[in-house]
Amino acid sequence: MYKIGLIIVICILWSIWPQFGFRKDLQIIFCDVGQGDATLVQLGTFQLLVDGGPPNEKAIECLGRYVPFVDRTIELVVATHQDSDHIGGLNSVFANYHVRELVWNGEEKQTADFLTFSQAIQREQDSGMRVSIVAHASEINIGSNLVATYLFPRVARFSNATQVSHKCETHLQDITDTNSMTDMSSNDGSIALFIRYKQVTILLMGDQETTGELTLSCLGLLEPMTIVKVGHHGSKSSSSMEFVSQTQPEYAVISVGKNNRFGHPSPEVVSRYDLFRSVILRTDLLGSIELLSDGDRVWREKSLFDI
């Protein structure tokens, strides 16, 4: 009985140890926030939070589980776009952590959650938080071989592309027209993030749909990926066959709520990733998903908290 008790104690301590210190491996945590997105990228003392999920406390609970409790600073928060299931939980993040910099797309939306978000931005900016609006594809070198690039289809420019097909030429010319950009779905205004850590590549697609995917493809910004956070929760409006065939991720992660009213993820989308033998990981089935990388390989971390 003593041995069994000792084993249980060791297992518990092992599972909660990350809360007491900083890991040397890159951590990518896809938080289970229900129907929404919140992704934490963590390397040493650096944290990047992409979106904060809907207006509930699930993102904060996820951060409390994975960010060492001695660290109350998040270096960078990226709000991919203004939908409530992506920005709704950020007010709680601002209230519980010191955020050094916020990056967002600068587009407004007439909702209560966006009003709360914009008020929080002003409050935190007055307290010293830097705020940046993405105006072009830009790269940030985080250090320790970790580089992130913002990809923003709304501000793509035809001059960035070379040797494009007629289809791409027409598409890129269309989206550079002001009226066409206005007509684009707000989902296609999502900031996508391309992250490279040594040999490992990660693409976080926000809610980008097929128009945004085609833009990234035409600009030559898509390549085989190690990890893809599937766009728009696995909706059939995203993850075209062209996109999936170009990225062919080893891991396809779908952030989605249980029994959601939208029917996400689409079986058609799931079958496309299956076709390319991607390991499909879903938050509605697995809860929060933690992937670790040493820069050469990726593996899934499991704990006693896993479903």
Locate the predicted segments by residue.
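Non-globular, low-confidence helical/coil segments that flank catalytic cores
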Residues: 1-307
